[in-house]
């Protein structure tokens, strides 16, 4: 622990498991005044900080949550948008409801959170926003990630727009693009592919590992290190970029 976020108010969404939890743990260990949210209020248990249930698809809930947080913590220094959903399939497998749900959770949730918490950052004339995008499809085309890739590409565009709009006001906004990461979300995808293909879980998992140039999956902690850097003052001259942590997958 070196206090890289000492005293900074940092909010992490989807902090109950996987990448979100690893980021929240790293932030707390580095001295952040952590606010960790998840749709399931039980998942963030064990984290050091303020733990709250939050549905990032509901603007009214976000606004009520923001009022409570503002009274206790004041404006945010760091916002990490981590909530997301991976749809399995091509354009032919994507019904309107799949498209709408994916866009709502993967993109509009970030829009809602930024729109709500950015004004406080502007008052402080400083803030770092970190959006979790993906190397999959948004950077490199991957089969069966049609709407997921579209939404994560939108996250990169959203990130660049916010960075450009508020660069003069002390706001930085960056995207993190993970490759294939060992996480509950990956487990769900492996199960889905196994059920659709009739192949065993072990064989499907081997396929995921085989497409990694480094010959292994990434870890949530490796993504968290990058998020920590982008949240901290160490990255004070960096904004508006999509940063890969993909084990060379996009090469």
Predicted regions and their residues:
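Residue(s) in the substrate-gating loop at a strand-loop-helix junction
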Residues: 134
């Amino acid at each position: 622990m070196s206090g890289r976020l000492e005293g900074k108010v940092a909010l992490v969404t989807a902090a109950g498991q996987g990448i979100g939890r690893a980021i929240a743990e790293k932030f707390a260990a580095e001295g952040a005044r952590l606010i960790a949210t998840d749709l399931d209020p039980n998942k963030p248990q064990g984290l050091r900080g303020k733990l709250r249930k939050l549905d990032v698809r509901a603007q009214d809930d976000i606004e009520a949550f923001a009022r409570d947080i503002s009274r206790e913590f004041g404006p945010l220094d760091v916002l990490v948008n981590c909530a997301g959903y991976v749809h399995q399939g091509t354009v032919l497998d994507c019904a309107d409801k799949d498209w709408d749900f994916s866009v709502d959770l993967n993109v509009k949730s970030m829009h809602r959170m930024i729109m709500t918490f950015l004004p406080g950052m502007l008052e402080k004339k400083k803030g770092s926003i970190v959006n979790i995008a993906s190397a999959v499809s948004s950077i490199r085309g991957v089969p069966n990630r049609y709407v997921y890739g579209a939404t994560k590409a939108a996250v990169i565009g959203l990130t660049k727009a916010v960075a450009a709009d508020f660069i003069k006001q002390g706001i930085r906004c960056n995207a993190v693009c993970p490759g294939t990461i060992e996480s509950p979300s990956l487990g769900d995808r492996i199960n889905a592919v196994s059920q659709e293909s009739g192949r065993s879980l072990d064989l499907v998992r081997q396929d995921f590992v085989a497409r990694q140039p480094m010959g292994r999956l990434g870890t949530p902690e490796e993504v968290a290190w990058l998020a920590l850097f982008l949240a901290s003052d160490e990255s004070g001259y960096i904004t508006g970029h999509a940063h890969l942590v993909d084990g060379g997958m996009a090469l």
